[in-house]
Amino acid sequence: MNIIKRAGVFIGLVYFTVLLIIYGEHIVRSYATEDCMPAGLYYYAEGAAYTNLPVCKDEPKSSYKGTELFPTSPNIDKPLRMTTDIMVHPISSTSDLGPMDVPPDMYPMYSCPNLSNSSPLPLWYGSCINSCQITSSKETMAVTVWAINSTVDIIMGYKLTTFFETKFSHVGPFGGCSISLVGSEPRSAPEALISGWRSKILSQGNIQDAAWYLYNDPECNYFSDIYSSGFFVRIDRIKLTVLIDAVGNLYLSDLVAGSYDSYDKGFATHGNNVWIWDTDRVKVDNNCYFKQTDDTYCDYDNTTGYILCKTIGVSFRSELQTRVESPCAGHLNISTDGVIYRLEGTADTPSTQDRLSSILKNNVNLGMESLISLINDVFTNIESSYCTGMCDLMEVILSNYPTATTVLETPIGPWLPITTNGHTVMTACSSDPNWVIKTPVSYCYSKKMIKVVNKDTMREAWWRIVNSYIILNETCTDENTTSFNLVKERMELRQDITYSFWRGDLIVSYPYNKSRWITYKDEKIQRSSKWFDKLLPLRYNHPITLDNITMELINHTRDIYDVHVYPSQGSTSKRPMSDVIGRVGAAGSNLIKHLVKGIGETFFWVTQHIELICDILIIIVCVVIGYCVVLKPILYITMRGREKQQPVIVMRDEGRSHLFSRSTATNAL
């Protein structure tokens, strides 16, 4: 009976072991999915139906570098965009703004075109001297200045983020096949693929969020691991702003910092990001995007070829870049430095001396209007003695100090001196106070610039805050730059972060929620002022106030610390008491966060290696079961059969015989 029971138990254990071997891997893998995607996405492969996949939190990354099928595009420079509209950190108190004599004019006062359109210093000097002569006649032009409202439309498009992935299949010792992701790296796709993606996406209609796997999973082979590679594409639905330039070309600007992409192409590629849009969405027929900003009289300078509009603070080259025809503005000229204007008429204006002589020869009853006009011109030219002296002085200063980078208000308008190839050249600029900081703040650390936007034209530009002017074609070149790394190092040491403006320094102190202002006391920064009150002052229509700058840069600095520095900091040997007190509330949650993160990473590692773990566990279980069910009973039976028989001793006592073993006899004795 005992043998039958043992045989039944043995057969049952063998049957259970066989079932475990056959179905064990499949059961475990059903709870350990290798493929996942962000929530809301769907799977698509060429020739395959849409398939829902489980949700995972992050895009899988790996140090494994797969075979490179296409050349990797160079990195695209990007500005840091940290502050959001809802991430507002309060300024600790109004006293943090600094002393009461903080200059209020902390905004760019001028805009300058491409610095390649410059005049040699001697040529500028000749023009300056000519403007001071009361005996010289001038060619006067009636000019209307125009601006372009470049925003045409806001359309819906798609942003694609491309990764090149590598997967491999592995078959375990008991036949279970698993597929694992071993490589996922950002990579740009060739235009041939992008064109096909664009056609497919636009034909499918309104795709909100999607993910495409553009390669097949590797097949399973018991004797070798099989690899498969291809593109994984994430698709996001976004809004795109379509702009128009002065000659009517549609384009998209700043998809990445400083980018300019033609609308007619239908897509743009920067790094591993692709933007796609429908080119049939925007029509510009009979629409007007020009707006007249000024109507004034300007002087033409034969020496430099510049048109000088003193009353509006604009100087520009008379050389034409192109002419355009607008349905609402008519014929317009575009100068080589980008000013849009139209000449309404020209006339020769006699010199002040000639006009005075003419009036003296005529009847004294000419009228008060002419007399007032004459008196105004006489007083205007009283400054000619100062004017010529200032031309001489400026030429000497700029010749000996060619590194000057301040826009100067000269007798012929605002000019910027710059140095190129060892020579000082002059660039005409415009008084343009309509620039404001764009929010959320975009700060470029490599060049210490802030992105600003013109309230009239909505044009965006980068402002190098150490200067009083904007260079309209300046671009940002931030991409993990040394400058940004130095800022992070200073934050790790709890040191001040300084933003140097052209009128002083804004200092943001740890824990980066308060600031103070230091005005330049040595007066090395020259104030761009007007010569006489007769010249119109700058019209600060939309000033960037110090409060505005302070709040935005404090928010920006604090965000960088919270995102890039604080999460990666461990314990330090010396920690200020203010830091301990200020962050004691976050210590507990931070500890829990790291514990949860550690548990999650451990669980993620287990799920990634579940097939190997299951194989090992199955082998261990089989060995244990084999030992308990098969080997142990056999050993037991074998060992029992080998037990030695004890000799029997026969003892007789009073006629009775008893059988004793040797041990019993020994005990009896």
UniProtKB/Swiss-Prot annotation:
- Work out whether the entry's keyword set contains Transmembrane: yes
Residues assigned to the Intravirion compartment are: 631-669
Q: Which residues form the signal peptide?
A: 1-24
Q: Principal place where this protein is found?
A: virion
Biological process (GO), any one: virion attachment to host cell
Q: Which residues lie on this side of the membrane: Virion surface?
A: 25-609
Q: How does it assemble?
A: Homotrimer. Interacts with matrix protein.
For this entry, the protein name equals Glycoprotein
Q: What's the encoding gene here?
A: G
